[in-house]
Design a protein with these regions (language model features):
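Active-site-adjacent structural elements that line small-molecule/cofactor binding pockets in enzymes
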Residues: 1-198
Length: 198
């Protein structure tokens, strides 16, 4: 967290036109932007846990997190607001598997997403494709189905996304994890998004 906050402070100083030299925890020597943006970009903080989100609320310009079928992202959003993020934008990445049948949605999720069910602490230590494949063999379908929203019913997705909006998420990024992107785009464009945004 110290490195993250120090990096954010350095970026903000650079965007303000300052020359920055720091020793620790991030070293910079007379860093300077020769061309600055007219408007500094938002500095979003990424959080998967309420503790990190609460810490980010006090200094980040916004939050980005990942939706979970169990609704853990509601706790993350609440902690961000509690920590000082009230009124700041919140971005949500929604991993989902949509197809026209539940079986296709489940099999697409299993086929494409089973390597992504492990925590970052495990994944960041894998070095070869073989290590990823070995890990995939240990994943069961239930592990995948607990990590993403899976349904062939557009009404389920409408309900879930409305809940996300009610939680205060201002930007939703929908990621259909299976390969059937054409059906996803067509059906969400015709049946899901109009229900949410009119």
């Amino acid at each position: 967290n110290d490195r993250l906050f120090a990096s954010a402070t350095i970026m903000r100083s650079l965007w303000a036109g300052e020359t920055v030299s720091t020793a620790a925890p991030v070293r910079t020597v007379e860093a300077r932007l020769h061309t600055r943006p007219t408007q500094p970009p938002l500095l979003l903080g990424a959080a998967l846990t309420p503790a990190t989100a609460e810490w980010l609320g006090g200094w980040a310009d916004g939050l980005i997190t990942v939706a979970t079928p169990k609704g853990d992202h509601a706790k993350v959003a609440g902690a961000f607001r509690h920590g000082g993020g009230e009124g700041k934008p919140m971005y949500l990445k929604v991993d989902l598997s949509y197809a026209r049948t539940d079986e296709e949605a489940r099999s697409g999720a299993w086929d494409q997403w089973r390597a992504n069910v492990y925590p970052a602490a495990v994944l960041e230590n894998l070095r070869t494709p073989g290590e990823f494949e070995a890990l995939e063999d240990l994943a069961g379908p239930r592990m995948v189905f607990e990590k993403i929203r899976i349904s062939a019913d557009p009404k389920d997705h409408v309900r879930w996304l409305r809940t996300d909006i009610d939680l205060g998420f201002t930007h939703l990024y929908l990621h259909n994890v299976n390969r059937n992107q054409e059906t996803f785009i067509e059906d969400f464009g015709n049946e899901v998004l109009p229900e949410i945004f009119g």
